[in-house]
Amino acid sequence: MEQAQRSAEYIFQGTMYFFRREKILCRYQFALKDAVDPALLQRALDAALSAAPYYRVQLVQEKREAFLEPNPNPCLVYAGSAQRSIPEETNGYLFSVSCEGDTVYFDWYHFLMDGRGVSPFLTRILELYCNLRYGTAFANTPIVSSPAYDIEAMMAKYPAPEASESTL
């Protein structure tokens, strides 16, 4: 990935949580009306990821900088309700989808996305799952994501004020 496409400044803000001894994960859990079929949930996850490449990333560290880069590994649905060690036990992904009984669990690092940012992705997964499992006809609207954070463009658009005698 080109240096200009990397969003190091944004990622730097969140890596303090990533490298803590006690990792902080967010979790949503969804109780469905029937037992979850892991194979269908895997198909739904794969389809959702193909429509939302932002989530198909891994954290890459180079010296003192960290970047999100494409993750070529498969993103798997895991069995059970226990939180997995992310990214060590998730093929490098910064989130995890698992299921047990009638419940789907979704764990993620907050610096990748917040609750508002994760909602369209989770909705897409659940709608795709319901379409596969029950033959529903959810439309699966596109997931909109912002372009990569570009500090140079922001600084050019909003330059720092020049110092004057009154501010010295």
Q: Where do the model's predicted regions map?
A:
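Non-catalytic N-terminal regions of enzymes
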Residues: M1-A160
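Flexible, P/S/T/G-rich "lid" or insertion loops adjacent to the active sites of thioester-utilizing
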Residues: Y158-L168
